[in-house]
Amino acid sequence: MSDIEKVVMRTRTIEKLLRTQYHAEGKGLHQLITSCEERLPRDVVAKLRFIATVRNKVVHEEDYKLDDRKGFLAACDACEKELTPRSSR
């Protein structure tokens, strides 16, 4: 799976969690985060911002390379775990 595919798939999951569990609103991931950031821990917001920035660069910048794939995936894992309701874990 290419970096673009992996990034898009992971961010779609996070977007869905933000919309369904936190009633986030907006077009992009940054807007979704902004709409519900008061209800999220600061460390999660920081990770989400990192994820959103990487996603935008991967999708919109032709020459962007995902240098820290492991770090990106770890941030996604941490955010998905934090955003998933405890009863669903």
Predicted feature locations:
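Amphipathic alpha-helical interface elements
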Residues: 1-53, 60-89
